């Protein structure tokens, strides 16, 4: 790639609160910053200010459509600060010759920690017990109902990638028996492999969802899966909300078809089914599994490394395969 006397123009789009990329990019590039609170629409802003932008850094879940890309004629690389890329029209990027990078393993430790935290919270009923004490009910009514032990649980992991592997290692420390379902069997994995999620659910007490959202994994956890998991079964989701048929999950939780759920992601964020709010066997968090200062610093460094590599014609650190 030809050298230029001026730094390349990089476009950064982010929510107003996520400023962690601003300084690191402006030190290296001519950076244009837009945020989700702007009164000017992106199709209006781009032609007037960003037509020369060669890189587009997205912090958040902006839908990247073919129509949006049409307003960025100079764009060559799309840098996502998320691992999931289901908000991007991959076919349009491929057709336009735009390469894509994602966050790689920047969030894996923190998401795995959150998954384990949700599982412990659901099984031991920690948030419900906290509310019981704060409300004064302990003094009024005595002991709180018992939770379930974590140790020894059979845990099925859906998606044994980086995050799924980290979840497995953490839960091994609790004496949990790990098995998994993934696109293909991992020859180096010591865990039992199930080729379909129905068998995984039938032979486990817990399902932890760590996989990407694709056409194949959309609603991978449906009513049949939850019925096989059983009345004491628990679902933990730190992947994507649409991995679960949310309406059926709500019915299963209310009717006692499954025993509980720990959810960091939802089908129509930030909307959450109100039926979940009154259930003590459900623990909710606002899609924050990835969000710690350490992980945000990690992803900023990965994004910067990808940009530097691209503009120096070196291999990318975390490329997304479009084939």
From Swiss-Prot:
Homodimer. The keyword Cell inner membrane does not apply. InterPro entries: D-isomer_2-hydroxyacid_DH, D-isomer_2_OHA_DH_cat_dom, D-isomer_DH_NAD-bd, NAD(P)-bd_dom_sf. Inhibited by oxalate. GO terms for molecular function: glyoxylate reductase (NADPH) activity; hydroxypyruvate reductase (NADPH) activity; hydroxypyruvate reductase [NAD(P)H] activity; NAD binding. This is Glyoxylate/hydroxypyruvate reductase HPR3. The active site is at residues 240, 269, 287. The keyword NAD applies. Belongs to the D-isomer specific 2-hydroxyacid dehydrogenase family. GyaR subfamily. Keywords: Glycolate pathway, NAD, NADP, Oxidoreductase, Photorespiration, Pyruvate. One of its GO terms (biological process) is photorespiration.
């Amino acid at each position: 790639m030809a050298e230029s006397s001026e730094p390349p123009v990089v476009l950064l789009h982010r929510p107003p609160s996520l400023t962690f990329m601003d300084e690191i990019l402006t030190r290296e590039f001519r950076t244009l910053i837009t945020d989700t609170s702007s009164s000017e629409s992106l199709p209006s802003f781009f032609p007037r200010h960003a037509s020369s932008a060669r890189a587009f850094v997205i912090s958040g879940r902006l839908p990247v459509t073919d129509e949006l890309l049409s307003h960025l004629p100079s764009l060559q690389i799309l840098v996502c600060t998320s691992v999931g890329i289901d908000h991007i029209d991959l076919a349009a990027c491929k057709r336009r010759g735009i390469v894509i990078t994602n966050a790689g393993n920047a969030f894996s430790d923190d998401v795995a920690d959150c998954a384990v935290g949700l599982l412990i919270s659901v099984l031991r009923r920690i948030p419900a017990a906290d509310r019981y004490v704060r409300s004064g009910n302990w003094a009024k009514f005595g002991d709180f109902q018992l939770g379930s032990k974590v140790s020894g649980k059979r845990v099925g992991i859906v998606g044994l990638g980086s995050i799924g592997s980290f979840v497995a290692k953490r839960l091994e420390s609790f004496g949990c028996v790990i098995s998994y379902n993934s696109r293909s069997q991992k020859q180096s994995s010591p865990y039992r492999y199930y080729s379909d999620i129905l068998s995984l659910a039938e032979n486990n007490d817990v399902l932890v969802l760590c996989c990407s959202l694709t056409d194949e994994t959309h609603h991978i956890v449906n009513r049949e899966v939850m019925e096989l998991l059983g009345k004491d079964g628990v679902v933990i989701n730190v992947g994507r909300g649409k991995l679960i048929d949310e309406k059926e999950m709500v019915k299963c939780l209310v009717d006692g078809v499954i025993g509980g759920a720990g959810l960091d992601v939802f089908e129509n964020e930030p909307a959450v089914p109100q039926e979940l709010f009154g259930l003590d066997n459900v623990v909710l968090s606002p899609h924050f599994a990835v969000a710690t200062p350490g992980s945000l610093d990690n992803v900023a460094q990965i994004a910067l490394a990808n940009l530097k590599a691209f503009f120096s014609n070196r291999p990318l650190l975390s490329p997304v395969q479009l084939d």
